[in-house]
Curated annotation (Swiss-Prot):
PANTHER family membership: S-ADENOSYLMETHIONINE SYNTHETASE (PTHR11964)
Pathway: Amino-acid biosynthesis; S-adenosyl-L-methionine biosynthesis; S-adenosyl-L-methionine from L-methionine: step 1/1
UniProt GO molecular function: ATP binding; magnesium ion binding; methionine adenosyltransferase activity
Gene it is expressed from: metK
Family designation: Belongs to the AdoMet synthase family.
InterPro entries membership: ADOMET_SYNTHASE_CS, S-AdoMet_synt_C, S-AdoMet_synt_central, S-AdoMet_synt_N, S-AdoMet_synthetase, S-AdoMet_synthetase_sfam
Annotated spans, Flexible loop: 102-112
EC number: 2.5.1.6
Subunit relationships: Homotetramer; dimer of dimers.
Cofactor note: Binds 2 divalent ions per subunit. Binds 1 potassium ion per subunit.
Residues reported in the UniProt entry to bind L-methionine: E58, Q102, D244, K275
The organism's taxonomic lineage, starting at the top: Bacteria, Pseudomonadati, Pseudomonadota, Alphaproteobacteria, Hyphomicrobiales
Annotated organism of origin: Methylorubrum extorquens (strain PA1) (Methylobacterium extorquens)
GO biological process: one-carbon metabolic process; S-adenosylmethionine biosynthetic process
Positions of ATP binding: H17, D169, A170, K171, K235, F236, D244, R250, K251, A267, K271
Protein name per its UniProtKB record: S-adenosylmethionine synthase
Length: 391
């Protein structure tokens, strides 16, 4: 029987965290190619370190996207994040690009030909999850860990008062107490943020960030018993890739459910939507969210599996964690009928062949508001009525 009274913790990192800088650049490259050719194929990895950005990977796309274009887009991305420090500056960084053609062996397994449908870009397992703990149907700890950092970043960029003294690199961690299976309060808050003014100490930084944190969290969740840890090392001036090297794809739990659900292991950023690591994880979230939105369960975990070159998923698994009102085995069949889970079917249904990925690279791929141009389409609940009517 699942526990109903417990503590659960999730962390988030800001767009200025070195790994997130790398994710942003990789997805900026993806967007550049998809803008020029919606069927472009990419697998792009980025290394960021002191005064240097290295982009490497495989591409099948138009020659109209030049390395000079990508260098300019990289500098724009770093500038938007906010890095203008001596060890990592958008204008002065060395940008090295090492992209080459996609392997023909991989392409032949993925490409549609004759009567063969487009196959998955790789084997793997992907998970989707939803819970009725927040308006976005996300687990509360990761949802609010993201919100804290996003609100602080928005204030920093808008130069709102003393928030302008903060730097781009930051991390948050939120511990939530559950009673009777529902989130009721925050017991621990951890916030480490870079600050540009070297004279600031932990108390000064807390005075800056506390109002934003309190506003981000539900009223009453923070009380006299909540323990705060703000810049516990005391000083955080050197941040971002100048402090630690960053790599694409190293924050996969931050990107998803904060540890509240299983993870198949595949990262998202730098991959075009033929890569099921990305597109099938989005589809699994879409299905799980619509199951919960339809009132069929309070919590839902969905697993999908694929083989390279094979169009249809090898399996689907549903776990409603004892909160469901319907039979899980029947729901598996209903979900397979409700959405074409082939790579092409997912891309078509969710309109994934668009330049919509740079915006996903920080503050979570899930629990976001769908955009008018198709971004975060997997967060829509337009399948809920169809699922409800199947029972």
């Amino acid at each position: 029987m699942p526990r109903s009274d417990y503590l659960f913790t999730s962390e988030s990192v800001s767009e200025g965290h070195p790994d997130k800088v790398s994710d942003r650049i990789s997805d900026t490259v993806v967007d550049a190619y998809l803008s020029a050719m919606p069927e472009a194929r990419l697998g792009v990895e980025t290394l960021t370190t002191t005064n240097r950005v290295v982009i490497a990977g495989e591409v099948r796309g138009p020659d109209s996207v030049t390395f000079k274009d990508l260098e300019e887009l990289t500098r724009e991305a770093v500038r938007d994040i906010g890095y203008e420090q001596s060890g990592f500056h958008w204008k002065n960084n060395d940008v090295a690009i090492h992209l080459h053609a996609q392997s023909a062996d991989i392409a032949q397994g993925v490409d549609a030909a004759g009567n063969k449908d487009e196959g998955a870009g790789d084997q793997g397992i992907m998970f989707g999850y939803a819970a009725d703990e927040t308006p976005a149907l996300m687990p509360a700890p990761i949802f609010y860990a993201h919100k804290i950092l996003k609100d602080l970043a928005d204030a920093r960029k808008a130069k709102q008062g003393d928030a302008a003294k903060l730097g781009p690199d930051a991390k948050s961690q939120v511990t939530v107490r559950y009673a009777n299976g529902r989130p009721v309060e925050v017991t621990q808050i951890v916030l480490s943020t870079q600050h540009l003014d070297e004279s600031l100490d932990s108390a000064d930084v807390r005075a800056i960030v506390e109002p934003y944190i309190l506003k981000a969290l539900p009223q009453g969740w923070v009380n006299e018993g909540t323990v705060w840890h703000v810049n516990p090392t005391g000083k955080f001036v050197i941040g971002g890739p100048d402090g630690d090297a960053g790599l694409t794809g190293r924050k996969i739990i931050v990107d998803t459910y904060g540890g509240a659900a299983p993870h198949g292991g595949g990262a998202f950023s730098g991959k075009d939507p033929t890569k099921v690591d990305r597109s099938a994880a989005y589809a699994a979230r879409y299905l799980a969210k619509n199951v919960v939105a339809a009132g069929l369960a309070r919590r839902a975990t969905i697993q999908l599996s694929y083989a390279i070159g094979v169009a249809k998923p090898l399996s689907i698994y549903v776990d409603l964690h004892g909160t469901g009102t319907v039979d899980e085995a029947k729901l598996e069949t209903v979900l397979m009928d409700a959405l074409d889970l082939s790579p092409r079917g997912i891309r078509t249904a969710l309109q994934l062949n668009k330049p919509i990925y740079a915006r996903t690279s920080a503050y979570g791929h899930f629990g976001r508001e769908p955009d008018a141009d198709g971004g975060f389409s997997w967060e829509k609940t337009d399948l809920a009525d169809k699922l409800k009517s199947a029972f």
